[in-house]
């Protein structure tokens, strides 16, 4: 409907959340030229770069991220107000709401699949918790997608294979004769690199128990940046779990690391009760399930 939301704001928010001109054109139902013109105009007005164009993707600048954080709550409020006071006789568009920590690559994959299928949706991103999910699914025409597991009476979990699995980095001083000293590992905190927190822990628990003989690993889910995590690893203060693809991208040596295979990223889909469920929901959920199952992270 967009009678309250400024066109420039909607384009900016959409580009921030899709990271792609091609996906944004499908979401907004306009061609690429007007999108480029709006962003170029904004950059001239603000005298600051908003995006760096690289290999077909848009990388937000720090300036753009600052603006996004400040205006997103305003955008969400206006959008909700439009939905509330809009014409009651018109079927509301299905909303797909992504948890703000959901991996960008899978987010773009889902958006692209929904767009190609012709499913009319409104894409949003926001921080969620169990209470927010409950409220959204009681009052909105939406599906909430998160890599975090919250209690909700209507939900399902999809698993996406993690390409190459993950590497468990162990402090060098814990190795004896080329093998990790199990006795020294017990009780050592296990840190998660960003993104690894959302993996299915059953597989990782099983690896610790079967391979290392550790039945109760000291997992730490604190938000620690990669530099600090690597420093603690080097000092022998912690172990570290990092996806294989990240190890390759960073060029990390895996001489003192163990490979954990068969790891999957868990995606939880939250949606309204069956009384409020519509064919649009079933179609979208089935499509998302298929896409996540066939893909790798």
From Swiss-Prot:
Keyword Cytoplasm: yes
Signal peptide residues on this chain, from the entry's feature table: none
Domain HTH lysR-type residue range list: 1-61
Summary of the knockout phenotype: A disruption of this gene is no longer virulent in mouse infection. 20-fold reduction in cytopathic effects in human monocyte-derived macrophages, loss of actin depolymerization in macrophages.
Location relative to the cell: Cytoplasm
DNA-binding region(s), chain positions: 21-40
InterPro entries recorded: LTTR, Tscrpt_reg_HTH_LysR, WH-like_DNA-bd_sf, WH_DNA-bd_sf
Stored PROSITE patterns: HTH_LYSR (PS50931)
Keywords: Activator, Cytoplasm, DNA-binding, Plasmid, Transcription, Transcription regulation, Virulence
GO cellular component, one term: cytoplasm
Molecular function GO terms recorded: DNA binding; DNA-binding transcription factor activity
Principal place of residence: cytoplasm
Function field: Positive regulator for the plasmid-encoded virulence factors SpvA, SpvB, and SpvC.
Further remarks about this protein from its record: In Salmonella spp. the spv gene cluster is encoded on a highly transmissible plasmid.
PANTHER family: HTH-TYPE TRANSCRIPTIONAL REGULATOR LRHA-RELATED (PTHR30579:SF7), TRANSCRIPTIONAL REGULATOR (PTHR30579)
Family designation: Belongs to the LysR transcriptional regulatory family.
Protein name: Virulence genes transcriptional activator SpvR
